[in-house]
Swiss-Prot record:
PROSITE patterns, A to Z: RIBOSOMAL_L27 (PS00831)
Record-level GO cellular component terms: cytosolic large ribosomal subunit
GO biological processes: translation
Protein name: Large ribosomal subunit protein bL27
Family that this chain belongs to: Belongs to the bacterial ribosomal protein bL27 family.
Length: 90
């Protein structure tokens, strides 16, 4: 008859890899259509002008331009892409 309890394995020791969420293009940065601006879970940032939102809430640029973050009075932060003026391209 054993007089010592069998040693059990630890029930801890599991962790998931980081998901690389966050802002990928900051305010004032130049983006082209399709560039990812932010990866998020839920709507920490909301899409504004010329910004689309994917099924996983990823924000992406729809046009070429500069990224702008703007806080509204209701507490929401909107991300927009301001197109570069047509005169600057000529």
């Amino acid at each position: 008859m054993a007089h010592k309890k069998a040693g059990g394995s630890s029930r801890n020791g599991r962790d998931s890899a980081g998901k690389r969420l966050g802002i990928k293009a900051y305010g004032g940065e130049y983006v082209i259509p399709g560039n990812i601006i932010a990866r998020q879970r839920g709507t920490t940032w909301h899409p504004g002008l010329n910004v689309g939102m994917g099924t996983d809430h990823t924000l992406f640029a729809k046009v070429e331009g500069r990224v702008e973050f703007r806080a509204k009075a209701n507490g929401r932060t909107f991300v927009s892409v301001l197109p570069i003026a047509a005169e600057a391209a000529e």
